[in-house]
């Protein structure tokens, strides 16, 4: 691990005097959402992140090189690191072993007061004690001082006092826990979710080896990840399905006092900006001062270079938007006393980090461009092309703005609006085809359900510049009906419906339309997905009939179960089973009963847990490169169902 990636501890001792106690643990089980966000699958996975964050704190301090995360049979989790081991001596404030304090007292840890760690992540340092409080049981073993210490807990209470169970020739901590079924909606861990997070952490900490293993029977898999190139390799990974404009990943880094900043940049031939930022290894999706400093410096440096070499006239400078078209950049800062806005740490507030990042990018990127004129020209050419297209896009956006301002008068001809005006109570079905749109219009509850049929070939926005998207006649009705604008003008507060439901056939064509719409929402109306307004309707696949009795099934398994139920134990009873080819085959009553009635329907909310992964997936599915798409199809073919027959 290079010196840049390390932030050395204040001193090399790590004992009980570094553990500070701030408050008790009583509230965690009463209000778990305050500490881990939710008790859904997201919160379940957050337990793992909290323990891993503690191990990464040791890595940031320069004392840990290996972390292993294991999903055990029964969905218990084991996290092992080779750091110094949690202190086991007596903690001065409490007179109890520090290990006990760390796992039973909220806000007890070496990350407070500046004594144990200069740099630390975690959710406000609640870490180990919150995981303990929300676990049915937890066992922690510490290898330290040549001995193995062990403690056991249940729902935050001690079930076995700290004791020595053996000797050891190494140091580190191993934690195994089982989430409490009383606290969580699900106890099943998703390997891909954990794998993605661990890979991200390995990229952010150059040279740190993170291994993930799934030991559940029938699901065995795993990977050891170690990236000596750090965030440079992260950028290469993000761009793997894109065509880079230049081979090198530009790497810029610097230190001021106890703070470090590093930036990795590579442009590609797409029209999308992918900017991913972190503070103390915590993703900051809403940006903050580090992003502000980067953006300002990037635009300033490109303009200065362009003016110096006659590519840009003094009065025609490129904008920040132009400068970032096609960029993939990762920004990672490590700092003491990080100030995050909000409990979710979505935005970094430390003002001095802006100056640090701005200075690094200003100085080092200017030198890089001078030394690599071919790369500089390719970046400037792309920015200038974006600049020329921006004016056309601006005019198209202005047109949309004017239409949106007119409200109902500007609504699309094919929109069948609802009577209710309160967006919190309304929903819009975006439906494939006029025939399905007709059935949906007749079958809906017009008090709160609006219908917008789509027809013709829809634009693949992954391959189109913004001005083409803004002016597209197939997307205009969607933009206008939703009423919240597009691109940088998009404002969720202006949404006319708080449920945007994509209703398409359960076949290949329907899947394609869903993907095209989701790509559009992701690239040009991302808050729509981020704030949970987008849904996918789930129409039935089968109709089963026995005389006058009729049932519908939404999967092959449900079809078989209903068929057996309708036979009533008599295998000779004939059940007529027909597969719905499309939404247009259903009459209005059937469509209402199966797909639109809020009391009976199934809706799938589209969520965005990992923007980097989503970005790569949309590029792979809808971008120019065929080979990654082919590999994806071949890899996933075993899980596919027969969509067309």
What are the residue ranges of the model-derived segments?
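C-terminal interaction appendages of subunits in large macromolecular complexes
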Residues: 388-407, 422-427, 438, 442-444, ...
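Short conserved segment of the HATPase_c
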Residues: 86-109
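Mature N-terminal segment immediately following signal peptide/propeptide cleavage
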Residues: 17-30
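Helical (often loop-to-helix) elements that flank the catalytic cores of nucleotide-handling enzymes
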Residues: 92, 341-354, 552-558, 562, ...
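GHKL-family ATPase ATP-binding module
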Residues: 1-15, 25, 49, 57-59, ...
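Conserved short strand/loop->alpha-helix "switch" segment adjacent to the catalytic nucleotide/phosphoryl-transfer site
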Residues: 30-49
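Residues immediately C-terminal
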Residues: 57-58, 85-86, 508-509
């Amino acid at each position: 691990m290079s010196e840049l990636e390390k932030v050395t501890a204040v001193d090399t001792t790590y004992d009980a005097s570094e553990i500070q106690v701030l408050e008790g643990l009583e509230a965690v089980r009463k209000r778990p959402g305050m500490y881990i966000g939710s008790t859904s699958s997201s919160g379940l996975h957050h337990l793992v992140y909290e323990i891993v964050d503690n191990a990464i704190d040791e890595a940031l301090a320069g004392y840990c090189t290996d972390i292993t995360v294991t999903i055990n049979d029964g969905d218990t989790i084991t996290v092992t690191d080779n750091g110094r081991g949690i202190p086991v001596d007596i903690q001065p404030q409490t007179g109890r072993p520090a290990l006990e304090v760390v796992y039973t007292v909220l806000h007890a840890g070496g990350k407070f007061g500046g004594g144990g760690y200069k740099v630390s992540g975690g959710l406000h340092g609640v870490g180990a004690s919150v995981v303990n409080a929300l676990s049915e049981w937890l066992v922690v073993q510490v290898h330290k001082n040549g001995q193995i210490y062990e403690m056991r807990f249940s729902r935050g209470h001690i079930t076995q006092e700290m004791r020595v169970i053996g000797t050891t020739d190494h140091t580190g901590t191993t934690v195994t826990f089982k989430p409490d079924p009383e606290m969580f909606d699900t106890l099943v861990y998703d390997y891909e979710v954990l794998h993605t997070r661990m890979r991200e952490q390995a990229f952010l900490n150059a040279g740190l080896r993170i291994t993930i293993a799934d030991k559940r029977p029938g699901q065995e898999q795993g990977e050891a990840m170690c990236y000596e190139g750090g965030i440079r390799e992260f950028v290469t990974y993000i761009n793997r399905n894109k065509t880079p404009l230049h081979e090198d990943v530009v790497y810029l880094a610097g230190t001021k006092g106890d703070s470090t900043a590093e930036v990795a940049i590579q442009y590609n031939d797409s029209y999308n900006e992918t900017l991913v930022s972190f503070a103390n290894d915590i993703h900051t999706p809403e940006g903050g001062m580090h992003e502000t400093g980067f953006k300002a410096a990037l635009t300033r440096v490109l303009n200065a270079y362009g003016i110096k070499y006659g590519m840009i006239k003094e009065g025609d400078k490129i904008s920040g938007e132009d400068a970032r078209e096609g960029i993939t950049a990762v920004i990672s800062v490590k700092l003491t006393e990080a100030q995050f806005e909000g409990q979710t740490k979505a935005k970094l507030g430390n003002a001095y980090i802006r100056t640090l990042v701005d200075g690094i990018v200003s100085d080092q990127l200017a030198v890089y461009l001078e030394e690599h004129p071919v790369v500089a020209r390719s970046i400037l050419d792309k920015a200038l092309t974006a600049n020329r297209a921006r004016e056309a896009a601006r005019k198209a956006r202005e047109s949309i703005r004017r239409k949106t301002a007119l409200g109902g008068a500007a609504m699309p001809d094919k929109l069948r609006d609802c009577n209710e005006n309160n967006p919190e109570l309304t929903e819009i079905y975006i439906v494939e085809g006029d025939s399905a749109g007709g059935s949906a219009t007749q079958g809906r509850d017009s008090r709160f359900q609006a219908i917008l049929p789509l027809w013709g070939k829809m634009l693949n926005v992954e391959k189109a510049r913004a001005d083409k998207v803004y002016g597209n006649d197939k997307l205009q009705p969607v933009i206008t009906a939703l009423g919240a604008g597009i691109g940088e003008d998009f404002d969720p507060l202006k949404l006319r419906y708080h449920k945007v439901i994509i209703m398409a056939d359960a076949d290949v064509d329907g899947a394609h339309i869903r993907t095209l719409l989701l790509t559009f929402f992701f690239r040009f109306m991302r808050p729509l997905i981020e704030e949970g307004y987008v849904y996918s309707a789930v129409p039935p696949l089968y109709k089963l009939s026995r005389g006058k009795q009729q049932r519908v099934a939404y999967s092959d398994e449900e079809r078989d179960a209903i068929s057996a139920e309708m036979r009533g134990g008599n295998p000779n009873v004939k059940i007529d089973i027909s597969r719905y080819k499309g939404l247009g085959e259903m009459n209005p009553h059937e469509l209402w009963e199966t797909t639109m009635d809020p009391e009976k329907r199934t809706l799938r909310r589209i969520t965005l847990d990992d923007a980097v992964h989503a970005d790569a997936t949309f590029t792979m599915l809808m971008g120019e490169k065929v080979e990654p798409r082919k590999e994806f199809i071949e890899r996933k073919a075993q899980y596919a169902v027969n969509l067309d027959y």
